[in-house]
Amino acid sequence: HVEIFFDPQTHTDRGIKFDTVINGIYKALKKAEKEFGLSFKIIMCFLRHLDEELGFKILEQASLHKDKIFGVGLDSSEQGNPPSKFEKLFKKAEEKNFVTVAHAGEEGPPEYIWEALNLLNVKRVDHGVQCLNDDKLVKKLRDSQIPLTVCPLSNVKLQVFKKLEEHNLKKMLNEKLMVMVNSDDPAYFGGYLNQNLIETQAALNLSKEEVKTLLVNSFKSSFLNEEKKSKW
């Protein structure tokens, strides 16, 4: 099972039609489903360095492909672009029955995670590693078991941590947070899921039980329905 993000504004801004972007992605995923049994969900992200108003135009186009697009997210440059900038847009997305997620607390402060939870009503926080700098937030995340999609190789590439050995994933596990390992953008950040797991396990000396917990958490945190989750 895979839940992939795509940024349509990267392509529509250079003249490629929204329909062309989503139909190409969807066609490839359907082919993988048929050939490899790979189930999927598609999440469309808004680029946070752009104006919220531009997001409404993209959302309208996404609404025409609701049969393909499961949810909406928020990515790109985090610093100076808080989730609150997109509160109205995410409310509109929820009205259109899109599930909401958002990148928060990777390079940005814990306050961005609070905003993602309280203003964007996200069902999952992407990254979220800065949460350990806020005890109240840690308690909130522990009690609610809101998933955190941690991307270790990405964090190092962006210098959130200078090296993988300094990553706080093990501390997040010790806090009983609903964390898992993800790949972010493999082409940019140097590895798909397996590579992230292998390098992180070695760097942090994770036990077999800790690796198992990360994998189990990923299934729990997926947007698969309960029937399909139970098969795993």
Segments (PLM) and residue ranges:
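Short HxH-centered metal-ligating active-site micro-motif
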Residues: 103
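Metal-cofactor-binding active-site regions of metalloenzymes
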Residues: 1-98, 107-111, 119, 123-124, ...
